[in-house]
Amino acid sequence: HRSLTHAYSAKTKEEHEVWKKSLRDRLWEITGMNKCVYCEPDAQYLRTDRINDLIAEYWGIKTEPEIEMPFYLLRPEQQNPDCKQKKHPILIVPHGHGGGKESTIQSQTKFIRDALEDGFLVVCPDERGSGDRREFPEQGEEPEKIRMNSHRELLQVCIGFGQSVIGMAVWDLMRLADYLLALSESNGFLACAGMSGGGQQTVWFSAMDDRVKAAITSGYFYGFKESLIELPQNCACNFVPHMFETADMGELGALIAPRPFFVESGEKDGLNGKSGLNNVTTQLDVTRKAYHIFNENTYPIHSIHSGGHQWVGTGMRTFLIKAMEKE
């Protein structure tokens, strides 16, 4: 399984940069991101909602000429009128499976509230096929419908065009970053954090875009063989043509080096695969090779909790604060 076209083998910074460009170019192609079409965001404010006592502005941007991405924008000064900060770091929190942007705020309220207290603009978007972007078979406001996604339908169609669900998701996050970093209230620091499918989006987005200055993934960092090839019942968004010939999770992590990177794992998380945490740590060992080339020994941070497939969050707030100080 390690006979990969882009297995990590760099020994110097120069070799790392050559490898990084080569793998990114290959991922740009096999994910179908090269088929996406750029357009201006044409941002639209729609309304303001209150979720778990947090004030959330509902916005939308265009990520392709006929593709719209809705997101919630939460501002520190709306939660705390005493906030005098004029420029803010930005934290994108992609959702996992089982809901959209609303579920992010509902399930990660403390993390989001802490980030707002620390001055972040917090942004919770809908991924293609989820939330307000579900295709017609899954549309509806019933709880069971809201928890569904259309990733299988999307993959079945987009694979015929040489595209993938994760490729489209990363493209959308890149276009969202374009818009957010251009805001007058942005201070230029961008972080991304997600659980499960949100962790997947975070890892891939951070691997493909150096503008992400700090990345947090929970419940998504493990070797592909045990967690995807041997567990093919996982969501269709995990699968990219030729990926299993190209690179493994450790290589995706190496693309993030030397930026601050935080991985949270549950001891009992079944998605880790049959060897459990060993399927996580062996991939992190690959990632650490890249960090060591840059003499970076602090990252990646690996936080392990005793639970299953769940977000715990211990140490994440401190991680983000230190990452900002590093900049």
Predicted features and spans:
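N-terminal cap/lid segment of alpha/beta-hydrolase-fold proteins
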Residues: 29-86
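Cap/lid segment of the alpha/beta-hydrolase catalytic domain
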Residues: 84-87, 92-182, 226-230
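Mobile cap/lid helix-loop segments that gate and shape the active-site cleft of serine hydrolases
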Residues: 152-153, 157-163, 175, 212-254, ...
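Short glycine-enriched nucleophile-adjacent loop
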Residues: 173, 199-210
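Conserved strand-to-loop "acid loop" that flanks and positions the catalytic carboxylate
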Residues: 257-276, 306
